[in-house]
Swiss-Prot record:
Its main location: secreted. This is Putative defensin-like protein 157. Keywords: Antimicrobial, Disulfide bond, Fungicide, Plant defense, Secreted, Signal. Disulfide bonds join 31-77, 41-60, 46-71, 50-73. It comes from the Eukaryota. GO terms for biological process: defense response to fungus; killing of cells of another organism. It comes from Arabidopsis thaliana (Mouse-ear cress). InterPro entries: DEFL.
Length: 77
């Protein structure tokens, strides 16, 4: 009887661990927002504003070659 209880315990722990990992993965979603879309991007301002407002990472990225860069902020949703 002890062998059945021990193996059942380990199976339940394995199932519980898998569900815990799945829930954690769902919570790690990342969002992206364009900050001040019409304004030219200053890299230092972009980084500081994104971190202060969203606790994220800001980068100046041009949507197409030849266009001015926009401040793209990536943060946890």
């Amino acid at each position: 009887m002890a062998k059945i209880s021990c193996s059942s315990f380990f199976v339940l722990m394995l199932v519980f661990s898998v569900f815990s990992l799945v829930e954690k993965a769902k919570g790690d979603e990342r969002c992206t927002i364009i900050i001040h879309p019409g304004s030219p991007c200053d890299p230092s301002d972009c980084v500081q504003y994104c971190y202060a407002e969203y606790n994220g990472v800001g980068k100046c990225i041009a949507s197409k070659p030849g266009r001015s860069a926009n401040c793209m902020c990536t943060y946890n949703c």
